[in-house]
Amino acid sequence: MAMPPKLRNKLSAAVVGLILAGASAPVILDQFLDEKEGNSLTAYRDGGGLWTICRGATMVDGKPVVQGMRLTQSKCEQVNAKERDKVLAWVERNIKVSLTEPQKAGIASFCPYNIGPGKCFPSTFYKRINAGDRNGACEAIRWWIKDGGRDCRLTKGQKNGCYGQVERRDQESALTCWGIDQ
């Protein structure tokens, strides 16, 4: 089964341009995470209530992010690079099939970066990708659309909804399956 064009079209022109130019996984992932996470120099609570900063980091220099924490742009760039490299290394260690650069970026965003390794290891996605079922793995990414038990598909257009999670899963799936239909 080929990836539906509508999923590929959900990626930004910037991300698609990087892929078509042959960019590395770190470059693709940086662009994608900048688009999805933003980059806050001031600590804020994420959707789960955790204090985070930069592109969602919960720790800086081994210390937890706390209310009122502020960082410079330069420091956030360092934190973001460290987090990016950490999740890409996780993909290299834990995904047993060969991957293209966009596929590495998609998996890194979904598994270690967004849902966390603890939820990833027992997931259908993880089992399918490592069994070589790439289409099945990409389908399984799109199942992760609940936030606190709430189905995010039902929140489109709502203030304080979580519909962005549905879009993100579609985009992560598109990256993870980039090129398998060729």
What are these regions (language model features)?
Residues 69-123:
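Mid-length scaffold segments of soluble, non-membrane domains
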Residues 2-15, 19, 26-48, 60, ...:
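Long, amphipathic alpha-helical surface segments
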Residues 47, 52-61, 81-84, 88, ...:
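Secreted/periplasmic proteins that engage bacterial cell-wall peptidoglycan
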Residues 33, 53, 107:
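Short, conserved catalytic/metal-binding motifs centered on acidic residues
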Residues 55-73:
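Acidic/histidine-rich, surface-exposed loop or edge segments in extracytoplasmic proteins
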